[in-house]
Amino acid sequence: MPNNSKHKKKQQRRQQEAQKKSRAKQIETDKKNDEFLDTELDEVSPLVIDDDMTEFKNMPKVELHAHLSGSLSPETIKLIMESDETRAEEIMKKYKLEKPENMTGVFDCFPVIHAILRKPEAIRIAIRQTIKEFEEDNCVYLELRTSPKETDFMTYEDYLQVCIESFEAAKHEFPRIKTFLIVSLDRRMPFETAAHILGLIGEAQQRTNVIVGVELSGDPHLDGRRLLKLFVAARRFHGLGITIHLAEVLQNMADVEDYLNLRPDRIGHGTFLHTDPYTEYLTNKYKIPLEICLSSNVYSKTTTNYRNSHFNYWRKRGVPVFICTDDKGVIPGATLTEEYYKAAITFDLSTEELIGINQDALLNSFAYKYNVTDLTETFRKINNNVLD
């Protein structure tokens, strides 16, 4: 009997290895086919930006992946500077703020933006203006994310409270858009700091329904597994949605498998998930939705062009994909309308298909999944493709 048991285990291992090799071979074949088609399409139909985006502008849209600091428009930055001229002079002496020409330029903007957002009033202006701009772009549901910071003027608790108050005020000032907050836990954070912030979120949940989720963000080259237990706690004890920045760069795939097995509600970017047989298998098996930011990926050079985006790869396989902006303030041509336009012409999406993507996005929003509020009216607008 023992020999039979060993024999069966060996057979099972061989079968598992064979299945793994088979999946790897199929992925490679699919990838080559996709790349061939993308190359052919690029040669005969390069991406051309049209001035007329009326159809996409007038479409009610859902945004699930937008960072507050990266969404500040030049107009918003100007308003923040004008609110504190002394501070503005200090910042302008230290930094030179220019329109970025590439991703290095984008990253160069963030120290300036973080310096600007050190006071409560600056946070209030930033949130109000960003929500206002998304509403003007006919976004009907927005999850905006930010990482609490401790500054000379605010504690982590102060930062969260200012955010909550700003979102509450926006509900009344901008009733056409449903707005919620995702709190970012940065990969660089000490575990104790991230745990402290999660505790503050728990306290805030007793007073408000503004906070609907937490995310893992920060430098994609860093391993984020030391914070994994906090995301388990966030879901189990706080009832929060979980979204994880994963597989943004090939240089760090170390933490991907562990976070996929956590079965997060959504994945941010996930640019290279399909390049590894096992992570491709897990993503497909669990059908974990992907928040895809086309312009951000092209601008950061993690994808060579729009057609080489992983958007269509996963869409063909039945994995939900959502059109998002990431950092509309610092990445040129990345408003939500422009992202919908680019997705439509790149992947030949019909109006009905775009409506379907919006429906899926709202179904996977944290406010819907965790019964935070009634979204009947928002669903009506999306289903009928109307704004009123």
UniProtKB/Swiss-Prot annotation:
Residues 1-13 have a biased composition (Basic residues). Keywords: Hydrolase, Metal-binding, Nucleotide metabolism, Zinc. CDD domains: ADA_AMPD. N(6)-methyl-AMP binds at H67, H114, T146, S147, P148, K149, D186, G218, E248, D326, D327. The record marks H269 as: Important for catalytic activity. Its EC number is 3.5.4.-. The active site is at E248. Binds 1 zinc ion per subunit. It catalyses: N(6)-methyl-AMP + H2O + H(+) = IMP + methylamine. The keyword RNA-binding does not apply. It is an enzyme of class 3 (hydrolase). GO terms for molecular function: adenosine deaminase activity; metal ion binding; N6-methyl-AMP deaminase activity. InterPro entries: A_deaminase_dom, Ado/ade_deaminase, Metal_Hydrolase. Disulfide bonds: none annotated. Belongs to the metallo-dependent hydrolases superfamily. Adenosine and AMP deaminases family. This is Adenosine deaminase-like protein. It comes from Caenorhabditis elegans. The lineage of its organism: Eukaryota, Metazoa, Ecdysozoa, Nematoda, Chromadorea. The gene is adal-1.
